[in-house]
Amino acid sequence: MRIEGLWLRVLSEVMRKAVGMPLPLTHKDFDVKYVEALRELIRGSYVDKALLLAQDEVYDEEGKKMDFGSFHVPNDYLFKVCRENPEFVPAVSIHPGRKDALEELDRCLASGARALKLLPNCQNVNCSLPQYDEFWRRMAAAGLPFLCHTGGEMTVPVINRAYQDPRILRRPLELGVKVIAAHSSGNSHFFDQNYFGELIKLMDEFPNLYADTSALNSPIRSGVLKQVKESGRLGRFLHGSDYPVPVGAFWVRLRGLITTAQWREAGKIPNLIERDAFLKRAMGFDDAHFTRLDEVLRKV
């Protein structure tokens, strides 16, 4: 793990304290304690299982590893944690520019991968490059969905802001990949662009495009919640939490999406995963919103 810059250092500490982790990020037992804490949050929440995400390293278009990024969660570690904890479902991370990308994809499929996660703007992934076509085709053939970060990002370093636009997903969609646009393509800060309108245009064109509601109970991203609810396409939106991003009820109350009584009730829920689910149910998201992901994930 590498955290550079004052903003990321402050934010990482805010998130660590918000989720109740007593150990510093650099402590040798941090990973073990984090997994244990997350498992107990799942067990104590409305949610039965959680999609656990790996995080690949950053590569250039020639497949050379770049000295960029803040942390790396290997696929092997992901599979180990998921084997030991049935509450977790594995979403691997493979940069398609890696020299061994296809081999790693086949290996992860054989190991039971249910989805693949990337942050194109942070991991330098131009999804439109023709040299990645075979990677997308193999994902589509295997039924492995692509959970893709969309919109801005403030918790990890950004290498190319152009890749936060959901329109970069056109090529994987054309090749038949089921794509989940994380965060519903909303903006992450006041000066960031909201791409929700572009997301809806793509949804109208591609029935294999979905979006999730992860991190939408945060101060800025919550601004897209009303658009989601009024989109007329709720059947294409899936529940997500983006844990350990903190969850607050104040902003959705300020936007008129919940009542004062619901805001107070949410404040009594210390479990951030349960609080996030409670707020979405309070806003009117139905039971199917929380189970629809299982229909999209790869069957194993």
PLM regions with names:
Residues K99-L109, S128-D133, P157-L173, H189-M203, ...:
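Distinct, well-ordered alpha-helical segments
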